[in-house]
Amino acid sequence: MKNFTILHLSKTKKPKISYLFIDNFLFLLFFNVLKVDYFCIELAQSHKTNFIFKKVYNCSIMKKNRRIKKYNWFFMLFKRMGVIKYIFIIYILITFLISLFLYWPITHTESFRTSIKNNEVTFSYIDALFLAASAFSDTGLTPISIAYSFNMFGQALIAISVLVGGLGIFTLKVYILQTIFGSKINVFNSALTQIERGSADGGKTKKIIKVSVSTLLISLFVFTIIFTFIFYYSPYGKFSDIEAAKSYDLRTFNPYEFNVQNPKGDFGKSLRYAIFHSICSINNAGFDNIGSKSLMPYYEDYSLQIFTLIAAFIGGVGFPVIYDIYKKLNSYRKTQPRYRVTLFTKLTLITYVFVSIIGLLLTFLFETTSKNQFSFWNQSQYGSTFAKSFAVIFQTQTTRSSGFITTDYYNFTQQTLLVHSILMFIGFSSASTAGGIRSATVAIIFLSVVSMLVGKKQVTAFKRQIGKENLIKAINVFAIGIFLVIIGVLICYSTTNLNANSILPHEKKFDTSHILFVVCSAFGSTGSPMGIIPNFSGYGKVTLIIIMIIGQLGIPQTILIWGRNRKSNEHVRYIYEDVAIG
């Protein structure tokens, strides 16, 4: 919000000017996160229609008001750093701000505060920072149970963090100012939104934001209604059965939530679960406020799982793809011109389908051929063949972005864990709520390999040539992503006592494959839980925090943070020389 100059017009009196210095407060509180061009809102009364209308126009108050200029040195300092560094600093500041609230006992439940006081559980500031980074990056990894540890205020704070982080803080700001106030957006804010959730075509950024954010907000409202009815009427929820909830062998599947009230028939609890689950599904964050087992109590509720997959797909497909689909559907109307879908949308959707099918087939292959009695397919607790097949489909799709689980990942084979780690490493679409190296990156690398095999010098797709700069960027993103995952696995493995609490034979035993799974889950902003996060040391949690932030920003943007703000002029060109490769 900015300094508003409100002009009250009448026939007899002169305009009365009143200034609301809201921007100074917002600047000091959030370091000018919400800063845009100064503009005036003129409210006048029409003599003919007797309606109040407003006209939003830019004005040069900043040059005239010296008192305001002295508060802008922080903003100008950030602005000189460049767009990428500005976004990075704001993300870090917001993450620390959220962590302070989550560490504040006012957000905790009474039982959780008592447990901390009696040293029954440990909750350090690193845990709060980890949870804040996981929420704002739309990951979903957590060292503690949200349902048991945080009250309604704490859960609402986490949900808002997920929503703002998923839509994008700058994107949401531009959407509000553009849609509600009709304000014009300056070049700097356009660059912020283009980097955060825009497309390669900067001219379409404002349109993409308006269409995509509106679509996601409408979807959020619709899915909230759907999930409310499901939670209210679902007969499949497994809650509060004390005898069934007890599991003497932790290696077997047990979907029951102990000491949790079933939301069936409780509209207030159903609505609260639905709002939280809708926000996390749309924004591809694997959080839940049901209990400590994600969606395991609804293992047999296929309607909940299907709508969860649809919501996760809408949020993870990306802002440019949503805009393309909207324009394509709108072009079928007779009054609208024909619209050509971009190459980015085609590559994203085709790669998503292709990778999902490959991952699904490999998962079925490895699980059905397993001879381990504790493996997923061989446990009778998972029900019929149809129930197991649907669970495989759900888990394979959620590894692409959302991270919800209806099964215990500990029961999957080592081969399946590796496949799902690769799926999380790939992620979903660029400019979306998902993470990873993104689908378009994999598509470009795959097309370059195919071009080399068939002897083509150009990388083409759908009668379009992919530039060498995009190919080099895709290879760099892939290589740096592999490097980050390897470094993350080494640090987490060397600083974590994996089986500190696993003494008895019937308890879970973790190894390197589980570490790899968690690191890929953090990098892909997936948040699929493995139950190993509480065993991580402070160094391991900080490593995952860094990986989650990089997964949200994207590797190209992270590289530019440490680069020069100005492009260097290469006046000297050297002679080419071939180098033997392979």
Feature-to-residue mapping (PLM):
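Membrane-proximal intracellular helices of multi-pass ion channels
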Residues: 1, 5, 11-18, 24-33, ...
